[in-house]
């Protein structure tokens, strides 16, 4: 009976691995200009939607007990994603369920907003390996387009206009003069929180403020949830999108105190530009199931002590050494997992405060660079590595 139960459990792990692949999205080529496309634009009727799953990001834990408790209960979300291109621009539309509309009001520091982001791999000499899913990696940049749901946001504008920064009850004017004052204040408000960033790894994310990226994104909420749209050029100073475009989608839920790393995130997803030659190798990498034996991989992970530094299963005790991996299979490619096993210093994911947990240092500084304290497992045979990758790909949250 014990042998039968073990076989059933092993089969379950193997079957889970078969669900690892992401769909391939076709960016339909249209004759219409996409410069001003929005979520409700008629041109989207030509698009082909695919289901992309977004998993809770749990590799990095916040210094926020309540937020962490909420994140622990978050399930994976299904989003409907479509893309279009007109030969000059690419447009992406993301639809996801969210019953609550959480909007930035700038009236409280503990109110959080809904939002979404689309991440593109930056221009490099070689398309692969892809950047790390979390803000890129050294030599492998990413461009991130972030859109938040906002009402009226007031930010420093450098105009030295103090007169319109005071409370309306302190103006000393009434009637039409007060109405004029209110109108001028309203005109200063920013109702579109759209930002673009470039990054090559943790601590490097930098906002692009010089106008070198021309993009337009927006959000709209309805009974079914949010729709977020983005349009940007296929080519500029930071990206050269052609053939197959790898993208990653993230969404934030303000009701769950979502912000920064507290989000749901997809793995890299391939978008093929209709009418252009696809990158077959990249498509295969992003849409093909892990080839290893997940059951053997779990055994190998335990044998090689992976659970000594990482929280592998959601029910395992937390580790203060390496990042938690109980959702890593949802938002990581097989190539990234393989690289992390063989070259652990290629991407050093932030861990806990080393001063607070001096007995569990997760990196050392060598020649000015962070070097992971993780063992280099390049001594493992190829089959074992592929088995561990297949097992790690099964580690993901339940889909709501």
What are these regions (language model features)?
Residues 1-19:
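Gram-negative bacterial Sec-dependent N-terminal signal peptides
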Residues 22-24, 33, 51, 56-185, ...:
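Surface-exposed, glycine/proline- and aromatic-rich loop segments on solvent-exposed faces
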Residues 37, 89-96, 226-232:
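Short, well-ordered beta-strand segments enriched in hydrophobic/aromatic residues
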Residues 156-221:
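Long, low-complexity, polar/charged, intrinsically disordered or flexibly structured peripheral segments
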Residues 218-287:
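Long, compositionally biased interface segments
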Residues 278-302:
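Electrostatic cytochrome c docking/interface patches
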Residues 281-283, 366-400:
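C-terminal capping alpha-helices of c-type cytochrome domains
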Residues 292, 298-327, 331, 343-368, ...:
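Periplasmic/extracellular electron-transfer cofactor-ligation site
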